Amino acid sequence: MVDINQIPTRRPFHRRRKTCPFSGANAPKIDYKDVKLLQRYISERGKIVPSRITAVSQKKQRELARAIKRARFLGLLPYVVK
């Protein structure tokens, strides 16, 4: 019979907290004209990627969504991708 105390236990996996890419000293500013930056936060289907995936803070996520919607309205970004 195997003693339970003899079985090696795994160390618990701790996921490292991601930091917001728009916070900090030399962080990029969210601007609706910066299409290259905004495209990183849009999925291949043209949807805005949620903050739990991109690790953007709640305040900056709202700002980012507003900039993406403004760029779409002005024709800088597509609404849907084919």
From Swiss-Prot:
Question: Which stretches does the entry tag as region Disordered?
Answer: 1-20
What keywords are assigned to this protein? Ribonucleoprotein, Ribosomal protein, RNA-binding, rRNA-binding
GO cellular component term, pick one: cytosolic small ribosomal subunit
Superkingdom is Bacteria
* Gene3D superfamilies listed in its UniProt record: Ribosomal protein S18
Q: Name one GO biological process term.
A: translation
InterPro entries membership: Ribosomal_bS18, Ribosomal_bS18_CS, Ribosomal_bS18_sf
User: Which Gene Ontology molecular-function terms are recorded?
Assistant: small ribosomal subunit rRNA binding; structural constituent of ribosome
A family per Pfam: Ribosomal_S18
Tagged with keyword Transmembrane: no
Question: What NCBIfam families does its record include?
Answer: S18
What does the UniProt record say this protein does?
Answer: Binds as a heterodimer with protein bS6 to the central domain of the 16S rRNA, where it helps stabilize the platform of the 30S subunit.
Q: Which family does it belong to?
A: Belongs to the bacterial ribosomal protein bS18 family.
- Which PANTHER family has this protein been placed in? 30S RIBOSOMAL PROTEIN S18, SMALL RIBOSOMAL SUBUNIT PROTEIN BS18M
Question: Assembly and interactions?
Answer: Part of the 30S ribosomal subunit. Forms a tight heterodimer with protein bS6.
Which named protein is this?
A: Small ribosomal subunit protein bS18
**The species this protein was found in:** Chelativorans sp. (strain BNC1)
Name the lineage: Bacteria, Pseudomonadati, Pseudomonadota, Alphaproteobacteria, Hyphomicrobiales
